[in-house]
C-alpha cells in the first residue's frame, strides 16, 4: 500500500489498475465460493469473517485513496483540513456502527454463526442491500467488516499525513526563527523606505 500513500496524481492510473485487479480477484472468489462446500462451520466462519473481508477491505481502501486523488488538487495535498475532513468521515462511520465495531475489537464470537455464515443459511438480511446479494457467496456482516477494516487503514493514513504536515510546519517555523531578516542595504535606503510607507499611508 505504501506505493500509493504518497498521493501523487501520477499514480492515479497505477492505482486504478490495482483496483481493477482486486475487483477481478473478488469476482473470481465469489464464483468459487458459491459452489464450495466448507469442511466445517468453523472454516466457513473464518472465510467470511477474515479471509474475504481482508481482500475486500484492501479494495475499499484503495478506492478511498483514488477518491482522494480525484477530489483533491495537487496544491492541497499538504492541506491539514483535507485529512481532518476525511478522518472525521471515518470516525463518523465507526461511531454509527459502534456496536459491531466493538464486537470485532473485542474478538467476540457469540454471534459468529449468525453474522458470518452464508445468507443462504442464516437469512440474516442485516442491510436492505442484501436483498440483491448472492446468498451463496455473501454473509450478513462480511461487507461491514471489510468497510470497518478499510476505514481503520484510512484513519491511519490520514493521521500519518496530519502528523507529517504538522512536523513539516514546525521545521519550517524553526528555520524561519533561526534565520531572522537582516537589512543589508544602506541606512539611507531604509530611511527612504520608511518615508515612502509613511507618505503612502501604509503606516501611521
Report the location of each language-model feature:
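Intrinsically disordered, low-complexity acidic/Q/S/K-rich activation/interaction tracts characteristic
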Residues: 1-174
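Basic amphipathic recognition helices
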Residues: 170-203
Amino acid at each position: 500500500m505504501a506505493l500509493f500513500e504518497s498521493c501523487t496524481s501520477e499514480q492515479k492510473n497505477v492505482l486504478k489498475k490495482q483496483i481493477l485487479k482486486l475487483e477481478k480477484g473478488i469476482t473470481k472468489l465469489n464464483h468459487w465460493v458459491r459452489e464450495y462446500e466448507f469442511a466445517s462451520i468453523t472454516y466457513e466462519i473464518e472465510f467470511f469473517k477474515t479471509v474475504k473481508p481482508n481482500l475486500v477491505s484492501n479494495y475499499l481502501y484503495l478506492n478511498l485513496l483514488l477518491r482522494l486523488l480525484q477530489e483533491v488538487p495537487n496544491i492541497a495535498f499538504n492541506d491539514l483540513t483535507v485529512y481532518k475532513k476525511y478522518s472525521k468521515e471515518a470516525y463518523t462511520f465507526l461511531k454509527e456502527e459502534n456496536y459491531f465495531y466493538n464486537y470485532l475489537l473485542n474478538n467476540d464470537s457469540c454471534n459468529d454463526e449468525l453474522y458470518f455464515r452464508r445468507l443462504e443459511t442464516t437469512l440474516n438480511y442485516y442491510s436492505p442491500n442484501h436483498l440483491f446479494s448472492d446468498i451463496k457467496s455473501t454473509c450478513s456482516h462480511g461487507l461491514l467488516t471489510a468497510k470497518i477494516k478499510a476505514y481503520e487503514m484510512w484513519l491511519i493514513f490520514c493521521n500519518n499525513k496530519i502528523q507529517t504536515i504538522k512536523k513539516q510546519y514546525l521545521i519550517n517555523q524553526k528555520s524561519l526563527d533561526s534565520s531572522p531578516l537582516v537589512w543589508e542595504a544602506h541606512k539611507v535606503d531604509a530611511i527612504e523606505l520608511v518615508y515612502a510607507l509613511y507618505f503612502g499611508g501604509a503606516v501611521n
